[in-house]
Design a protein with these regions (language model features):
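Signature of N-terminal electron-transfer/Fe-S-associated modules in redox systems
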Residues: 1-171
Length: 171
């Protein structure tokens, strides 16, 4: 990673004082995840070495943020909010539908995520995606989709399967 992304890494490190390299952990992890598909143990050690922190500190960051993964995930990551406002507006039934549509086990989805047999999608149930007034909602990769119906979910999945989805803003 250091050799391939040396320019990007130097640019990131230049944003922080020399004695505060640990501040670069998040952007360095983003590079690692882009390169390997998830934050591998080797990538975590490499980020730790660059940021001059212990690997356990970097691993804790990976474990804290829902957009960093410590295990292989599908091409697209689908995160369904399960927090109280979304639950009150049907996220549990929505998650049932999503599991059925993608053919994954709900228990796995609720305990770390489940990936489809073809490797296209990983479905996760997560706590709060910060759009409580627009429930039920989900995030696919980095894009939010709000006030979704099961039919709209099915359409989105088909668009992502066929690469016909173009990013759009949901209001």
């Amino acid at each position: 990673m250091q050799e391939k992304y040396s320019t990007e890494i130097e640019k990131i490190l230049s944003k922080y004082p020399a004695d505060r390299k640990r501040s670069a952990v998040l952007p360095l992890l983003y590079i690692a995840q882009q390169e390997y598909g998830y934050c591998t143990p080797d990538a975590i050690r490499e980020v730790a070495a660059i940021a001059e922190v212990e690997p356990t500190e970097v691993d804790a960051v990976v474990g804290f943020y829902t957009l960093f993964f410590d295990h292989p995930v599908g091409k697209h990551v689908v995160q369904v909010c399960n927090d109280l406002p979304c639950a009150l507006r049907g996220s549990e039934q929505f998650l049932d539908h999503a599991c059925k549509k993608l053919g994954v086990d709900k228990h796995q989805v609720e305990h770390g995520g489940a990936t489809t047999a073809d490797g296209q999608f990983t479905l996760e149930s997560v706590v709060c995606l910060a759009a409580c007034d627009k429930a039920p909602m989900l995030q696919i990769d980095l894009e939010f989709f709000e006030r979704l119906t099961p039919e709209e979910f099915d359409r989105l999945i088909e668009e992502y399967k066929t690469n016909k989805h173009s990013e759009r803003s949901e209001a």
